[in-house]
Amino acid sequence: MATYYGKKYKLLELKHLFKELLLTTKIAFKSKELGKPKTKSPIYVAMIDGEAYHGGMCDRFKGIISLYAYCKYLGKPFRIKYTYPFKLEDYLQPAAYDWTLKRGEYTDNPLYIRVLYMRGEHLATRLFNLRAKRQIHFYSNRDLLEHINKTYAKEGTGRRPFNWGELFCELFKPGTILQERIEATKESIGGDYYAAVFRFQNLLGDFPEYRYRPLNDKDKEEELITKCLDAVKTLMAKHGNMALLVTADSMKFLKRVSQIDGVHIIPGTLTHMDGQKHHTQGNQFETYLKSFLDFYMLSEAQKVYRIGTPQMYHSAFPVFAAKMHDIPFESITI
């Protein structure tokens, strides 16, 4: 997604004001939750409900953590409504902070809510300017933490800036099934490991995502795969005998790279979480579980590498996985 500045950014904000009106009306029209919320003060709800484009898993976490940081600074009650294309509680549970919606807290009634749609906005200005006394439904796919920290943890405030990983771990811990898979995967690897992440974004034709087109050329596909395999071998020579975990969005590539001695992969299929539900085959629970498993396994590596050609996508997924426990991260262009 492009990042806008100046007049273009102001136009984006204006466009989003109209989007907010449309969302408010559309959601209320089909909602069965229109009662007056039973809360002492308005709650702030991070929305992942399928009513707008949310992005992939990492983009969703960016928006969630941004709103949580804002609420934590100001003492606002924070909740998450994550229902698309699955319920977040199927994979993650509340850790130190309970973000789950309680009976009677939530409403879609326009009399009691204010939709704040900030998809693509890299500044938290409109969030700072909120004066609403209504329940806030927040849509965002950007990491606003730096801007929020600079605003509320200025020198002289006595506040320290928040760390992305600490906020994530305050909110989330793996559910029972996810935790079991994490332990089983770590046992399979057998010790410390480092990780390499490759994001082909459908270049190899096996990961439908939005309108990204495959190469559709067997020779070019093989050239790209070989280049990435060579990068893996170069990386392994640098790290000696330590195990290497490789994650990617292409099953073609994972099948090839798994043939290299010392490389570990996480079995299973992948799908993009936003708008790709019709491409998800087989057991959907297992398919989405793999994304969470990849994320948590990356977060516990000794170091995470993002590797790709200029044509490949420089995903933020490994960047934020590394942020969870503040482990070293390096991006390599080949």
Residue map of PLM features:
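Short, aromatic/basic amphipathic alpha-helical patches
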Residues: 91-100, 252-263, 318-320
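A donor-sugar binding/catalytic signature common to diverse glycosyltransferases
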Residues: 65, 289-334
